[in-house]
Amino acid sequence: MTAASLEAAIEAAWEDRANVTPASDAVREVVEAALELLDSGKARVAEKIDGQWQVNQWLKKAVLLSFRLNDNAVIDHGAGGAPAFDKVPSKFSGWGENRFREAGFRVVPGAVARKGAHIGKGVVLMPSFVNIGAFVDEGTMVDTWATVGSCAQIGKNVHISGGAGIGGVLEPLQAGPVIIEDGAFIGARSEVAEGVIVGEGAVLSMGVYLGASTKIVDRQTGEVHIGRVPPYAVVVPGAMPGKPLPDGTPGPSLYCAVIVKTVDAQTRSKTGINELLRD
């Protein structure tokens, strides 16, 4: 089946999604084909074409349809060796040493990646969670307790620090996925959600929270960015002055993010990847 015919079949199933059940064998066939493309990295929910990110909505729809097709079942070999009860199997179900070596990435005990997520060569998954439809490109580190949400797009040589959250698209339903471009650094306990794009080489310090409406203020120029961090920007938490209250007293300040500088040699020395960890 060609990509065009697969897309058309998914779109048709989506229009009739209220009637999709575990007995919908024809729909299952095309949805599983789409999920295999996502799992292998041969297709992705968003891709950069001529410098612009384009979302393949039909692939996101395939992910959503899969939840109507599958019943919950016991999944062996869950986190910590405990069984789980879910609709999505582990990406690594049935894998042996040869399959892991062929894939070329590391999976530390406690890491969870669901079937339908793509993990590139040289990636390190510390005890973390990578959801269905996500794309994690080569050389990236997903550190301890970090989460890569459904359909999120993570570039090459990215560092997602401990406890950081990369939001998904499934609930609440989002039009586009979060995108972290090549070489970006996401600081510990930061959160990027609601389709925000973090540009190539950008650095978020610890505890930066970015959603679709978060103001990202350039301290030098006063320019305000919303929904996108410029490439190579260094971003820290900040606050905007609040509007006065009705009685004229100062109102509460509101959270924002602040671009304090552009990545320089000092920044790179603190946020660069360690090639020793990628072997």
UniProtKB/Swiss-Prot annotation:
Keyword Ribonucleoprotein: no
Binding-site positions, substrate: R106, D143
Single GO MF annotation: 2,3,4,5-tetrahydropyridine-2,6-dicarboxylate N-succinyltransferase activity
EC number: 2.3.1.117
Keywords for this protein: Acyltransferase, Amino-acid biosynthesis, Cytoplasm, Diaminopimelate biosynthesis, Lysine biosynthesis, Repeat, Transferase
GO biological process, any: lysine biosynthetic process via diaminopimelate
Cited Gene3D superfamilies: Hexapeptide repeat proteins, Tetrahydrodipicolinate-N-succinyltransferase, N-terminal domain
A Pfam family: THDPS_N_2
Location(s) in or outside the cell: Cytoplasm
Keyword Aminoacyl-tRNA synthetase: no
PANTHER family registered for this protein in UniProt: 2,3,4,5-TETRAHYDROPYRIDINE-2,6-DICARBOXYLATE N-ACETYLTRANSFERASE, ACETYLTRANSFERASE
Family as reported in the entry's similarity comment: Belongs to the transferase hexapeptide repeat family.
Record's protein name: 2,3,4,5-tetrahydropyridine-2,6-dicarboxylate N-succinyltransferase
Organism (species): Novosphingobium aromaticivorans (strain ATCC 700278 / DSM 12444 / CCUG 56034 / CIP 105152 / NBRC 16084 / F199)
